Design a protein with these regions (language model features):
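Protein-protein interaction/assembly regions in multi-subunit complexes
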Residues: 1-95
């Protein structure tokens, strides 16, 4: 995974994520939209043959889009860890 900042202005951040496609882009978009400071979030995969997502975030007021992206990343990580724990528990309880 490689991240390139394409555009950064007050209240707006656009980043390119090389090596990630729709799965990651959609997950990040959905998680960003749960953040109350985010006004708009979207992703684009410019070409179907290349694993590359472009994520755009626009925030409300004085919020920082970089912080919103950081919070979304941490939430995805926490949700994934919770899933692993619950899945492991479910497998153990099945036996």
């Amino acid at each position: 995974m490689k991240i390139n900042v394409l555009k950064r202005t007050k209240g707006l951040l656009k980043v390119e994520i090389e090596g990630e496609g729709h799965t990651f882009g959609n997950l990040m978009q959905e998680t960003l939209l749960e953040d109350k400071t985010v006004d708009w979030a979207g992703y684009d995969q410019p070409h179907p043959l290349f694993r590359q997502s472009i994520i755009t975030i626009r925030v409300k007021g004085e919020a920082q889009p970089e912080k919103a992206l950081e919070r979304a990343s941490k939430k995805i990580r926490a949700d994934t860890e919770e899933f692993v724990e619950k899945f492991s528990s479910a497998i153990k309880n099945e036996n």
